[in-house]
């Protein structure tokens, strides 16, 4: 198990990573997400031993690295996969994967598993971006690392290839049976691939939980907004035992709620675009469409309620409503929504 305790990294007088704590089980995949400059890559560099830590410790198996006792990268048995592939251009696929490898049977295993058997003699220049990343992954796993760090491995690939390759990488990591930390800026990638997701903000891990919990029960408004389109709807919530169903009341309907941070009384309800319906054909109206964004399979609308709250609603692409149209919006979800204390 990879264990990280109160890990902090300073660059001069600036703290870049602040008191990071996490444990990663065997074959578990942790996705790290956050805005640019939040400390994601710094964490990977610290875990790999490429930079020293300022406070705390990390350990795996028979080694422990601290601020006073630094364990170098070669003593950690860590595998790294980079966004730019980091392949040797003058070597073939086979030679890249076998580089400094004693047991070539492991190279054969991963070349076959990752669909590279017919490209053994090819140089990287002849490969597509997806094939290059498969070679990089095969090279990493063939060395039987104790844990794997992936730094935005799909960021240089097109959207269609990303969607398929993310599952190939996940499947390979699971078959290798090693813990992995995967840095990404893509929230959808994080939610779909990770066993758990960690959301970083200014060097602080704001939430570490299952993908479902990070999306539906975010620990903060920052997490709520970062993990997807988020609107906050004025509501009231009775936090006493008398409210058995944990019902939250709003101007556009009642829904079950999950109170966070001691929310009670006047509250803000976290609403995702798919929690709502929008109809411009009814005689009753309660909002005005401000703008619409076509997304292919759907359309995203921003609507202003008569009460003053702005919401975002996602509906079928076939349902086209023009801006400035009067419409009727209502809550349609049946699952509990996150409830935050009212923001003054």
Language model features with spans:
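Conserved coupling/switch loops of ABC nucleotide-binding domains, chiefly the family-specific signature
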Residues: 54-57, 202
């Amino acid at each position: 198990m990879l264990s990280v305790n109160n890990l902090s990294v300073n660059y001069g007088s600036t703290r870049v990573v602040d008191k990071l704590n996490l444990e990663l089980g065997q074959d578990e995949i942790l996705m790290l997400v956050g805005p640019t400059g939040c400390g994601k890559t710094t964490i990977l560099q610290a875990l790999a031993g490429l930079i020293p830590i300022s406070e705390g410790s990390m350990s795996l198996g028979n080694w422990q690295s601290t601020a006073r006792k630094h364990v170098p990268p070669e003593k950690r048995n860590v595998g790294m996969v980079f966004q730019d592939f980091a392949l040797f251009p003058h070597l073939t696929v086979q030679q890249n994967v076998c580089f400094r490898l004693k047991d070539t049977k492991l190279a054969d295993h991963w070349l076959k598993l990752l669909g590279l058997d017919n490209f053994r003699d090819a140089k990287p220049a002849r490969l597509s971006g997806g094939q290059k990343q498969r070679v990089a992954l095969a090279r990493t796993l063939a060395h039987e690392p104790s844990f794997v760090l992936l730094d935005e491995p799909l960021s240089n690939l097109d959207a269609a290839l990303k969607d398929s390759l993310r599952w190939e990488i996940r499947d390979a990591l699971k078959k290798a049976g090693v813990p992995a930390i995967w840095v990404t800026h893509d929230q959808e990638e994080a939610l779909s691939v990770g066993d758990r997701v960690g959301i970083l903000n200014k060097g602080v891990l704001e939430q570490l939980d299952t993908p479902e919990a990070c999306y539906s029960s975010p620990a903060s408004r920052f997490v709520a907004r970062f993990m997807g389109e988020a609107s906050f709807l004025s509501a009231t919530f009775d936090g006493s035992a008398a409210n058995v169903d944990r019902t939250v009341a709003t101007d556009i309907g009642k829904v079950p709620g999950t109170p966070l941070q001691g929310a009670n009384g006047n509250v803000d309800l976290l609403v995702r675009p798919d929690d709502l319906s929008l109809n411009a054909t009814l005689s009753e109206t309660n909002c005005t469409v401000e703008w619409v964004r076509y997304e292919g399979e759907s359309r995203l609308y921003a609507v202003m309620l008569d009460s003053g709250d702005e919401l975002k609603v996602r509906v079928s692409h076939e349902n086209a409503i023009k801006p400035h149209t009067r419409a009727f919006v209502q809550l349609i979800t049946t699952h509990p929504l996150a409830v935050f204390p009212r923001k003054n």
